[in-house]
Design a protein with these regions (language model features):
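Active-site metal-binding motif and surrounding structural segment of the metallo-beta-lactamase
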Residues: 47-102
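Conserved beta-strand hairpin/beta-sheet module of binuclear metal-dependent hydrolase folds
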Residues: 2-64
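Conserved Walker A/P-loop ATP-binding site and its immediately adjacent core
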Residues: 103-107
Length: 108
């Protein structure tokens, strides 16, 4: 059961700034790191820890919540920005095991 949510990111798939983006939002974030944003993700706290989306910034995002053991992972859809962090779960990285994976029908 989860009783608290942490916003771990609130930007579009690649975060901000994005590679090759010349819009003011990205240019400003390059000049001021306080304006940078990580890709959208949520941490679910309670008896265990759940993660919604596995982004490219998963290391920084989990550091924000003291690197909890992940019991559940939700992937809402298969855009690259929502799944890029999956490689970090493998043996060569964090060697995660026994994580319950929840996916939308579009992912299957």
């Amino acid at each position: 059961m989860y009783n608290r949510v942490t916003l771990l990111g609130n930007a579009q798939d690649a975060g901000r700034p994005q590679f090759a983006c010349t819009k003011p939002c990205c240019e400003d974030a390059r000049l001021n790191s306080e304006l940078s944003r990580m890709p959208v993700s949520l941490g679910l706290h309670g008896d265990s820890f759940g993660l919604i989306e596995a982004t490219r910034c998963i290391d920084k995002q989990l550091t924000m919540v003291n690197n909890p053991k992940i019991s559940d992972l939700w992937i809402t859809h298969a855009h690259l920005g929502h799944i890029e962090g999956l490689g970090q779960f493998g043996k060569e990285s964090s060697n995660q095991k026994n994580i319950q994976l929840h996916c939308s029908d579009s992912v299957y």
